[in-house]
Amino acid sequence: QVWAAVDADASLRRASSLPCNVEVTDVSAHKGAGLRWLCAHLGVDAADTVAFGDASNDVTMLEAAGDGVAMANALPEAVAAANHATSSCDDSGVARYLMPLLRAL
């Protein structure tokens, strides 16, 4: 019933970073909006950013980044939002993805 009530309210967004919690926020408050704000504030094109995520609360950020990368343990919705994937955090997935990019600079 709670999910139905939240989902029925177009002004709310629900997401989760862990199976044991839920995040209910204003529809405009999400990681994608935060990334776009930060890019505008710093004068950086969002197309030049890389974001890593694994949960439903990362979906908007993965979509907003120029390069959205799903971790190996990512939930299906995060994988669908990403355009690349990497190994898990336990396997240094972020470093494994970034090192070739940094070496190419």
What are these regions (language model features)?
Residues 100-105:
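Generic C-terminal helix-cap and adjacent flexible tail
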Residues 35, 45-89:
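Acidic, Mg2+-coordinating phosphoryl-transfer loop and its flanking beta/alpha structural elements
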Residues 3-7, 36, 63, 79, ...:
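Class I S-adenosyl-L-methionine
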